[in-house]
Amino acid sequence: MTKSVITEALRPIELHQVDRLALSQKLEDALDRVTRKLDKNIVAFGDKFPGEACENGIWPRTENVEWTTSFWPGQLWLAWEMTGKARYREAAERYLPSFARRIEQRIDTATHDLGFLYSLSCISAWRLTGNEAARQSALLAAERLMERFNPTAKIIQAWGDLNDPEQQGRMIIDCNMNLPLLYWASEQTGDPRYAQAATAHAGQAANYIVREDASTYHTYYMDVQTGEPRFGNTHQGYSDTSCWSRGQAWGIYGFLLSYQHTGDKQMVELSRSLAHYFLNRLPEDDVCHWDLALLGTDAVRDSSAAAIAACGLLELVKALPTLDANRAYYEEMALRIALSLTDNYLAHDDDPTEGLLQHSVYHMGSGKGVDQCCSWGDYFYLELLARLRQIWYPYW
């Protein structure tokens, strides 16, 4: 990575305003509320998966297709870690054959999201229980993901057929979260090519998806014939020049995951710059609008982006020395976001929704999942709970 990025000065806040004892009790109450919902959904879903987003508060039931199915077993693994109750492990393990079948038969696998899909379903199972079949499924997923790596452009193509001119050479900020599958595969097999591809992609994302002011494009196109940069645009943000909140959150968290696997401290500083841009554009309740350009408007919030960003901030705190000048600020803001999500966005038992974290946005432009629960929002809220309640080792 060679690009220089501006790091904004942080807006002033008063530190130590969150009552940690009170927050701890709130999080225990939240976990009780969450697990009651999970218990109902385990029965309601059977062998199906929740769709990407609720429709009028109800999860569409789907087969193991699309990019989000692993967020459900990911929630179950987190619930097992936090409660020790066997029913969550058993429910998560029931989905493992479906993920094995999906990758073996190439069912809806023409996507970079194999990292999401197999980190949270199979690597989690292997890390927590030593399940060898889950490990093999994840290794096969890494091999399939390598098929999407273009060595000339040095990127993993996000979506679609590799020969589709509309998709060729397109990388997106979300992919930073998929790279740990490749780093892990190198660690497991001793084959460096997986990690080399992941490192190359992370470098290209840092150089081209991140703008000089530390905002991010959602997507960026590279020339697959020459390797030269072409242009950036959005797919889910407000405009090509705005900053989609969830994308910025993926960046904060995702660059840190590359640091965790490579030790490249440039990734920590890049995450810091993205975090400053994000934190400086939060409304009064610390939960972002769906696009950061919409601060000061009545645009809907995206609680899922807030949960992702809070997890990323806690990962940033872990990566920094104790005496870092802004470390306490990042931790304070992660706690404030967690408090706001718990008080204002987490569904209550009597709320007419099957989801957990309300007021998320999937795709504003298509009207899909607007002001609904989204499966990744539910997952990252649980991950946030796990990070704040105990020593927790990521599945990424």
Please tell me what each predicted stretch does:
Residues 1-396:
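Glycan-recognition and catalytic cores of secretory/periplasmic carbohydrate-active enzymes
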